UniProtKB/Swiss-Prot annotation:
Pfam families registered for this protein in UniProt: Cas_Cas5d (PF09704)
Single annotated GO MF: RNA binding
Record keywords: Antiviral defense, Endonuclease, Hydrolase, Nuclease, Plasmid, RNA-binding
UniProt protein name: CRISPR pre-crRNA endoribonuclease Cas5d
Family per record: Belongs to the CRISPR-associated protein Cas5 family. Subtype I-C/Dvulg subfamily.
Alphabetical list of NCBIfam families matching this protein: cas_Cas5d, CRISPR_cas5
EC number annotated for this UniProt entry: 3.1.-.-
Length: 229
């Protein structure tokens, strides 16, 4: 594996807490899955995965109430008129944020090229500001900017207990529960369901540490069910 470090920032961010069902309320820091999404936006290949190790808070951001238009229906196989499902909801978002993301790039079993090849491609894109698709801070309307770390360090006096936080979604292959169709790297499309995984999040001395054992739980759910399918 290889360690990556990226600075990300933006004018607005919203990393939604799941316990607020109607209105969106943001965590003060990206969830591990949101941080992974930022890295995948910069560079992604099916031959490797990112494991986020920790997230540093450079600028905590100011809570800001924002009225947004959202669609109340989930996208399904059948089309629907957006205007019929549009809703106005208040979101408590963050204004003016910046973070450091540290993660490991880990090869998947079917990879044929060495890890340094992908690491060099990532670092090259990071320095040039290139990306696979537009990175965003929690929601697509809040674009993210990124660069190599510039020496700025997290606030060592910042300590927060954030409570339960979404770690990631485990896409469990299960033909007996075909709620979703998704792709498995190196195998194509399969059917199954998404299972959310949580952990108790704490910011200590400006850093949110991501428990490494959660990745093992994620892989057991995804790969274990695939082997038994």
């Amino acid at each position: 594996m290889a360690r990556l470090k990226v600075k990300v920032w933006g004018e607005y961010a919203c990393f939604s807490r799941p316990e607020f069902k109607v209105e969106r309320v943001s965590y003060p820091v990206p969830t591990p899955s949101a941080a992974r999404g930022l890295l995948e936006a910069i560079f992604w290949k099916p031959e490797f995965r990112y494991e986020v190790r920790r997230i540093g808070v450079l600028r905590l951001g100011t809570p800001f109430a924002l009225l947004r238009n959202e669609v109340g229906n989930r996208m399904g196989a059948k089309p629907f008129f957006v205007e019929d499902a549009r809703q106005q909801r208040t979101s408590l978002v963050l204004k003016d944020v910046a973070y450091l993301v540290e993660a490991d790039m880990v090869l998947r079993p079917h990879a044929t090229d060495p890890l340094p090849k992908y690491l060099e491609q990532f670092e090259r894109r990071l320095k040039k500001g290139q990306y696979h698709h537009t990175p965003y801070l929690g929601t697509r309307e809040f674009p993210a900017y990124f660069s190599p770390p510039d020496g700025e360090v997290p606030d060592g006096g910042l300590n927060l207990d954030l409570g339960p936080m979404l770690f990631d979604l485990a896409f469990v292959e299960d033909p007996g529960r075909p709620e979703l169709t998704f792709k498995r790297p190196g195998r194509g499309e399969v059917q199954g369901y998404a299972l959310p995984l949580f952990f108790h999040a704490r910011i200590r001395e400006g850093w949110l540490e991501v428990p490494a054992e959660k990745y093992q739980e994620l892989y057991r759910l995804e790969e274990g069910h695939a082997k038994g399918a």
